[in-house]
C-alpha cells in the first residue's frame, strides 16, 4: 500500500482502508486543532518521533475499552479503598503530558510526545477537546493520563506513574467519569498487556469505525462547531 502525503493546511485524510498492514496511512500535514479533530473522528492518530515527519496511523485491529468492561484487580481495589490518591481532572494537564514524555525518556524508550505534540494537545485541552486524569498524593502529582474527548468517545494518548498503581487509579477515574457522562468508548489505539488485563480488547477496524460514526459528532463548518448529523465519515 502507498503512504499518502498530506497537504499543509488542508485537513483531510485518505480512507483508512488504504493504510499499510502496520497501520501507517499518511505522512506530513500539521497538528492544527482542525486536523487533529478530523483525524480522531475518522479513526486516525499521529505517532512519530523527534526528527521524523508527522506520521498518521489507523491500526487494524484496534484496542478499545468499554467502560462497563473495566476489570479492577484485587490489589487495585485495595489501593482504591485505602484512598491513597486524590483524583483530579484537568488540574495539571501540561504537567501530565510532560511527565508522560519524561517517563518514556527515562526508560530509554524514546518518545513520540515531541514539543510540537505538547503544544498541539495543550491547544486541544484549552478548546475542550482533551482532558487529563490525575492521581495526587501528599500534594504531588503521582500519576495520570491524558486523552482526547470528542462526542461520546475518549481517545487515550499516554499515561505515567511515579508511585504504585497511580496510573491505574487515574484510569479508574476516567472510567467513572465516562460512566457518569455518557462516554461509551475508550480508544486505546494499540495493544498493550497492561490494558488487556484491565478489560480492553481488540476489535476489527471496520467495527471500530462503525462505532465512531454513531458516537462522534460530525463537523459543520458553516456553524463553526461540532454537531451530530448523518454525514458519513471520510474514512468509512
Residue ranges and their predicted role:
Residues 1-236:
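N-acyltransferase acceptor-side catalytic subdomain
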Amino acid at each position: 500500500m502507498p503512504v499518502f502525503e498530506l497537504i499543509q493546511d488542508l485537513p483531510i485524510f485518505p480512507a483508512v482502508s488504504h493504510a499499510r498492514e502496520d497501520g501507517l496511512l499518511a505522512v506530513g500535514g500539521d497538528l492544527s486543532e482542525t486536523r487533529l479533530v478530523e483525524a480522531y473522528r475518522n479513526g486516525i492518530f499521529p505517532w512519530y518521533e523527534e526528527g521524523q515527519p508527522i506520521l498518521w496511523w489507523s491500526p487494524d485491529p484496534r484496542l478499545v475499552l468499554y467502560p462497563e468492561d473495566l476489570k479492577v484487580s484485587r490489589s487495585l481495589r485495595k489501593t482504591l479503598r485505602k484512598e491513597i490518591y486524590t483524583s483530579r481532572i484537568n488540574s495539571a494537564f501540561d504537567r501530565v503530558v510532560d511527565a508522560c514524555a519524561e517517563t518514556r525518556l527515562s526508560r530509554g524508550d524514546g518518545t513520540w510526545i515531541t514539543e510540537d505534540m505538547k503544544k498541539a494537545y495543550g491547544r486541544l485541552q484549552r478548546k475542550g477537546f482533551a482532558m487529563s486524569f490525575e492521581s495526587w498524593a501528599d500534594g504531588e502529582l503521582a500519576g495520570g493520563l491524558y486523552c482526547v474527548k470528542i462526542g461520546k468517545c475518549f481517545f487515550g494518548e499516554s499515561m505515567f506513574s511515579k508511585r504504585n498503581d497511580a496510573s491505574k487509579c487515574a484510569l479508574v477515574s476516567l472510567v467513572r467519569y465516562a460512566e457518569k457522562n455518557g462516554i461509551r468508548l475508550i480508544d486505546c489505539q494499540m495493544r498493550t498487556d497492561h490494558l488487556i488485563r484491565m478489560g480492553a480488547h481488540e476489535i476489527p477496524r471496520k467495527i471500530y469505525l462503525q462505532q465512531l460514526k454513531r458516537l462522534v459528532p460530525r463537523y459543520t463548518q458553516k456553524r463553526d462547531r461540532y454537531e451530530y448529523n448523518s454525514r458519513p465519515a471520510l474514512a468509512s
